[in-house]
Amino acid sequence: MDSSAKGSKKDAPDGPPKDSKLPVSEALLDYHREIKENAVERFMFHIKKLREKNQKYQERNRRLKEEQNWHIKNLIKELKEKNLDEAPIVTREEVEEAMKEKWEFERQQEASLKEMRIQINEAEKLFLEKLSEKEYWEEYKNVGSAQHAQLIVSLQNDIDTVKENAEKMSEQYKVTLEDEKKRISRETMIQLKQRKEWATQHAVRFIDKNNYREIWENDWLKKEGDTASFGNVLSLLDFLPPDLHTAEPCVSSGQSRGSLRILAPFALQLWSKLSGLLPTLVTPDPVCIIWSFGPGQTNSMAICP
């Protein structure tokens, strides 16, 4: 086909007749075109040869591949026959034992798989819990922590305010308490003074002429008891009867209830001073009239001269 094309190309008129003269540039281009066409024809012929050679090589490779597969199959068959000839004889018991081992292994694998599934489920639950906890703490970090911080600051301010108010109230209560104590003490002194005056006025109403000497003696004993020294106390004891602790109580016929009320406190005050100075000289005796001035006996007892 290529040769016929080549012949046709050679037979076909190429360019203008020979007698016509062509320019130099066109003649040069025609020459280069002929060179390229010859080169293309040579390349096409070479490619054709290569294709034929490639086809032959492919046929040979296919045949070699088939022979290789046939030899491999024969070798495998021979190897299997050789292994079967050399393999030991397996009994029924060995097969059953192998099957039991295989079944036991499968059961163990199933149990381990079941346990692994349980562990995976627990791990997934734990992961979900931790994930929810993480989301909660992230939300708390982003939102709740700021709110709680503001709440803590507010509560701290409230606590400080309450403490400050409590301190102020405590100071105010202390001042009020001191004022109340002073007021109560002042009113108590006033009431005591008034009651003393009222008692004196009430006692004066019942005093007669015979009791003025007794009042004067009581005033003298009071002054002496307040200012007397140890020697004066001893001199006062000389005027008392030696059996004072066993003396019988007596009541003067001219004494009234008012004089007894006045005498009793002074007698008790005198005895308290004497007992403080001389605790061992006189033995207390509930029979003695000086110790007998109790709340219920001051109206009926007095010291007899």
Swiss-Prot record:
Residues 37-186 form a coiled coil. It comes from the Eukaryota. Keywords: Coiled coil. InterPro entries: CCDC83 (IPR026702). This is Coiled-coil domain-containing protein 83. Residues 1-25 are annotated as: Disordered. Residues 8-21 have a biased composition (Basic and acidic residues). The keyword Nucleotide-binding does not apply.
